[in-house]
Amino acid sequence: MKLSPLMTAALLGIAGLQAAQAQGQDTLAKIDKDNKITLAYRESSVPFSYLEAPGKPIGFAVELSNAVVAEVKKQLNKPNLEVALMPVTSQNRIPLLTNGTIDLECGSTTNNTARGKDVAFAINHFYTGTRALVKKSSNIKDWADLKGKKVAITTGTTNMLVVRKYNEEKKLDLDIIGTKDHADALLLVESDRAAAFPMDDILLFGLKANAKDPASLEVVGEALQVEPYACMLRKDDPKFKALVDGVFTGLMKSGEFEKMYAKWFRGPIPPMTQAIGLPMSKELKDNLKALSDKPAT
């Protein structure tokens, strides 16, 4: 059915009103009323949030989400609170949060000023930069080696913007292919349909660790931009932000955060039991003391 311009405008207006209403609501009150909290997860953001089995997300960010749930249950005195899980992508995570479908998104989301116009962010829990995953046999070692080649980038990510800008500045003439998720971009490189997969370096190390043939892949290039990751929550909800930040502050001050980091970034991770072996960055060490939610520009 083809909608008239008037009907289309009306529907868009309703959707915008619903999103505005959701943004203004008290998340804790919503959870209390519904007796349910809905957590978002990613399907292939290794080691932050990814599937170990169908419908079973695991990872560093999943454990952060679970710590928030424990505090919500405590504050609401609801030990049997229902915890619903919903997969999200880079494209739909913000709309699903602002319209009230999900209550918290902890995955591999960059905290930046542009997104801060639509959502709020908790204390930063990781820092990363854009690099490229390639096949070792390609002999690609830096960005200049990609001139005129196809690269696969997940649509809806800051990496897409960073690489487009770099491509224009350096006149690399890249053929950029947008993909639905990280796993799709990895497959394009593995099958030689793309020369590289630019993405946050930690996600590339995680995907490489769980790839079919990790030894055939490598992460190359200088980091184009260092950015923080943080959990997303709705804007204008200081009570819920205080709860989430309070949970993270407790984890960071008690040393529990560092134990979680060691588990997911230093030791072997499921399902391939390969270790990423990534020491904690200076930026993250500093933020364990600063407890900052400062965005990237």
Language-model features: locations:
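Sec/Tat signal peptide C-region and signal peptidase I cleavage site
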Residues: 17-22
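Extracytoplasmic small-molecule ligand-binding "clamshell" domains
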Residues: 24-26, 30-105
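Bilobed "Venus flytrap"/periplasmic-binding protein-like clamshell domains
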Residues: 38, 43-47, 57-74, 110, ...
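Extended ligand-binding regions for polar small-molecule ligands
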Residues: 63-71, 144, 149-150, 155-157, ...
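Ligand-binding clefts/hinges and TM-proximal coupling segments of bilobed small-molecule sensing domains
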Residues: 158-176, 215-219, 248-297
